[in-house]
Amino acid sequence: MAQGSHQIDFQVLHDLRQKFPEVPEVVVSRCMLQNNNNLDACCAVLSQESTRYLYGEGDLNFSDESGISGLRNHMTSLNLDLQSQNVYHHGREGSRVNGSRTLTHSVSDGQLHGGQSNNELFQQEPQTAPAQVPQGFNVFGMPSTSGASNSTPHLGFHLGSKGTSNLSQQTPRFNPIMVTLAPNIQTGRSTPTSLHIHGVPPPVLNSPQGNSIYIRPYITTPSGTARQTQQHSGWVSQFNPMNPQQAYQPSQPGPWTTYPASNPLPHTSTQQPNQQGHQTSHVYMPISSPTTPQPPTIHSSGSSQSSAHSQYNIQNISTGPRKNQIEIKLEPPQRNSSSKLRSSGPRTASTSSLVNSQTLNRNQPTVYIAASPPNTDEMISRSQPKVYISANATAGDEQGMRNQPTLFISTNSGPSAASRNMSGQVSMGPAFIHHHPPKSRVLGGNSATSPRVVVTQPNTKYTFKITVSPNKPPAVSPGVVSPTFELTNLLNHPDHYVETENIQHLTDPALAHVDRISEARKLSMGSDDAAYTQALLVHQKARMERLQRELEMQKKKLDKLKSEVNEMENNLTRRRLKRSNSISQIPSLEEMQQLRSCNRQLQIDIDCLTKEIDLFQARGPHFNPSAIHNFYDNIGFVGPVPPKPKDQRSTIKAPKTQDAEDEEGAQWNCTACTFLNHPALIRCEQCEMPRHF
């Protein structure tokens, strides 16, 4: 890799400049020449040098103008690294946290181990947490000799400074706004659940860099003495509008850093909006219960200004629902349709100190949230605009807010409000944020009103909008959005969704031009569980559509089966009807008896007719069948037979009878009984029928 002891490897120089942007280029080049372009050795040396330049202790008197011009542009990126989720694990690991997003190396991580870098395990995200130096200030936040005396105070990431004799070097590069959260905030329905900070300086013109969130936790040592963790003293949630990746804190803690197991550090995330210059950042701040102890904040007075920094463990919010949390957002002021802020109540029973601010160049307020505000001497020594959050207010403040819990910001005007440091920075009176629980409530909590926030800080250069909402869905009005606590509501609200919260805020004329920035912003989810919920919803919607298509197919199949069943039932009904009709055509028993008698009578008639036909054929044409029915009239007649009348027929028959008698042997058949009689008999021997009737 090295090209010689007298040459500089520009690739190594570029890597080191990105890893240590606060170190001047000439120092990095000199370090590379001394270490023969060895990356590990340069990282070890520059990690120590970076602390000096980061805290304003480096040598700024360079005779080389090219070095000075390079220094003005050296803060090009602040990078992050991920840390293990184990509370008591102190080493930097390569496992993914916060939604499996890889974080790059931080300026406070110390030495970068080349063989154990996360870049070998995961894809490196763009190391872009840019910062621009405003006009009239050098790269360390101090006014330049040629700059205007009334330039804007340089606000940013306060890291503290080591004690030196020079007051200008003691002045930190960034003027933070301190927000202290008192430990006695009551949890419940009226617990403040969201903190909106409205009012950030605009970005530098034509600046490709975005905003950053500088977060610094503080904690007091048990002995009362404070010290500064040099290379592990802070973490930054950085954001670049040109790269939509998100970077998460924290940096690698030192082995001496305390890890309160009950106080997990809140989760911080950033969001990439559609338009440049509309960057927002969100921090979820756990609120402690009344019984949970919380480490207070100490800001030591005097010239040392050293403080103990505690690096807490990150708790992955995606492991459960977001409960018991306060979300803080810092954004430009006077925005009608600002980006949406969603948060909920405290997630854990403990309080974690955190800081959230959004950087738009170097002029950004920094919010410090700790257990208690510093004393007056410490505030005078810092001489910076500060905001402290506590749960108590003065008696005068409580008189007007007895019916609603209020998170109140008041100004503590004192000697620090009028003091100026040697750098020309105007120190502003600190503002205190107090939480007012309601004085009167109906049993059962039905009459609990929504908590309010009052912000009064007349000397500050920035405008704050802080919204505190209870655990219930808010109403709708123009202003800053308060959270609703269902994940479905988080995803379904449109971009223009707003709430009805009485938000009292200060307007700053110096920041009025921020309104020219576009008002369109995306819905800020604020944590990885919302992204997971969004992906889950997409998956569930796709599954629902697939199931709906299957349901339609099943419905069609069911309709087809129903039609087939109806047709089969109709066929069965027709067959049954036909069968019933055929049964009805069969005659009954009485009808069959009648038909049988009719058939018998017809048979008798047929036989009679047949006999009559035979008789008619045998007797000739003069056969009279009616005379047969009268031959019984002569039976039993006594007396002589009357003589027949003499007529021609009788005369004709006489010779025939004579001829028959002459034959004596010709027998005759009786016409009635067909008995064969002797020819001499004139009557039938059986029926007495006359022979010639």
UniProtKB/Swiss-Prot annotation:
Residues 286-310 have a biased composition (Low complexity). It is a peripheral membrane protein. Residues 8-51 form the CUE domain. A zinc finger (RanBP2-type) spans 663-693. One of its GO terms (biological process) is heart development. SUMOylated by TRIM60; leading to inhibition of MAPK/NF-kappaB activation and the innate immune response. Keywords: Coiled coil, Cytoplasm, Endosome, Isopeptide bond, Lysosome, Membrane, Metal-binding, Methylation, Nucleus, Phosphoprotein, Ubl conjugation, Zinc, Zinc-finger. Residues 532-619 form a coiled coil. There is a cross-link at residue 611 (Glycyl lysine isopeptide (Lys-Gly) (interchain with G-Cter in ubiquitin)). One of its GO terms (molecular function) is ubiquitin binding. It is found in: Membrane; Endosome membrane; Lysosome membrane; Cytoplasm, Cytosol. Changing residue 675 to A: Loss of interaction with 'Lys-63'-linked ubiquitin. InterPro entries: CUE, TAB2/3_CUE, Znf_RanBP2, Znf_RanBP2_sf. Transmembrane segments: none annotated. SUPFAM superfamilies: Ran binding protein zinc finger-like (SSF90209). The keyword Lipid biosynthesis does not apply. There is a cross-link at residues 329, 562 (Glycyl lysine isopeptide (Lys-Gly) (interchain with G-Cter in SUMO)). Residues 97-130, 143-153, 162-171, 223-282, 334-366 have a biased composition (Polar residues). Interacts with MAP3K7 and TRAF6. Identified in the TRIKA2 complex composed of MAP3K7, TAB1 and TAB2. Binds 'Lys-63'-linked polyubiquitin chains. Interacts with NCOR1 and HDAC3 to form a ternary complex. Interacts (via C-terminal) with NUMBL (via PTB domain). Interacts (via the C-terminus) with DYNC2I2 (via WD domains). Interacts with RBCK1. Interacts with TRIM5. Interacts with TRIM38 (via B30.2/SPRY domain), leading to its translocation to lysosomes and degradation. Interacts with ASB1; this interaction promotes TAB2 stability. PANTHER family: TGF-BETA-ACTIVATED KINASE 1 AND MAP3K7-BINDING PROTEIN 2, TGF-BETA-ACTIVATED KINASE 1 AND MAP3K7-BINDING PROTEIN TAB. Adapter required to activate the JNK and NF-kappa-B signaling pathways through the specific recognition of 'Lys-63'-linked polyubiquitin chains by its RanBP2-type zinc finger (NZF). Acts as an adapter linking MAP3K7/TAK1 and TRAF6 to 'Lys-63'-linked polyubiquitin chains. The RanBP2-type zinc finger (NZF) mediates binding to two consecutive 'Lys-63'-linked ubiquitins. This is TGF-beta-activated kinase 1 and MAP3K7-binding protein 2. It comes from Mus musculus (Mouse). The gene is Tab2.
